[in-house]
């Protein structure tokens, strides 16, 4: 027997993962979440940046990274250089400033393409989840034909809702990116 609660829960995880991916797409404004994936080599172990420093937003397009331990400043700077952020850290000896450049029209369009690609991946993940549940349903011989069709309809409705949610989230991000 398929639990619809589990279907909705797994579908919800798809849009949550999609939202987390979109956080990493910068929109010309300072957002500390763009630093979430940065690992700093600290005493020989890769350590998340947010465990080594506080990140503040003093201005709309500036991130200020203040390490808890000043000796980690150079390692943090190197990790930012090595990342795929495309930002140049400015080290003033006690903190690092990251200036987020204004997006050009071309870079905005490129980021919108990236959002659409991520949205498509999320939709595929939702459809794969639907496929998994439909396969499980076909294997369940204890269900009557009516129950099976009703459950298939419910799974399809959950998938359709998830895809609508993904489209809504993508539209919001696209508008944010195209905003000047």
Curated annotation (Swiss-Prot):
UniProt subcellular location: Cytoplasm
Gene3D superfamilies (UniProt xref): 3.30.1360.40, Ribosome-recycling factor (1.10.132.20)
Pfam family, one: RRF
Region Disordered, annotated ranges: 135-156
Assigned GO CC terms: cytoplasm
UniProt-listed GO biological process terms: translational termination
Disulfide bonds: none
GO molecular-function term, one example from the UniProt record: ribosomal large subunit binding
Keywords of this entry: Cytoplasm, Protein biosynthesis
The protein's role, per its UniProt record: Responsible for the release of ribosomes from messenger RNA at the termination of protein biosynthesis. May increase the efficiency of translation by recycling ribosomes from one round of translation to another.
Family membership: Belongs to the RRF family.
Designated name of the protein: Ribosome-recycling factor
Lineage: Bacteria, Bacillati, Bacillota, Bacilli, Lactobacillales
């Amino acid at each position: 027997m398929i639990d619809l609660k589990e279907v909705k829960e797994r579908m919800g995880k798809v849009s949550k993962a999609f939202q987390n991916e979109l956080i990493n797409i910068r929109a010309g404004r300072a957002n500390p979440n763009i630093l979430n994936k940065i690992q700093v080599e600290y005493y020989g172990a890769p350590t998340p940046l947010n465990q080594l420093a506080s990140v503040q937003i003093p201005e709309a397009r500036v991130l200020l990274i203040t390490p808890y331990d000043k000796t980690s400043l150079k390692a943090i700077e190197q990790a930012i250089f090595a990342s795929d952020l495309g930002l140049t850290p400015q080290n003033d000896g006690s903190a690092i400033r990251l200036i987020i450049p204004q997006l050009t029209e071309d870079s905005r369009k490129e980021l919108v393409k990236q959002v659409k690609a991520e949205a498509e991946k999320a939709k595929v993940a939702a459809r794969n989840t639907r496929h998994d549940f439909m396969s499980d349903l076909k294997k369940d011989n204890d269900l009557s034909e009516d129950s099976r069709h009703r459950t298939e309809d419910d799974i399809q409705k959950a998938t359709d809702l998830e895809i609508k949610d993904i489209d809504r989230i993508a539209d919001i991000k696209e508008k944010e990116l195209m905003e000047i």
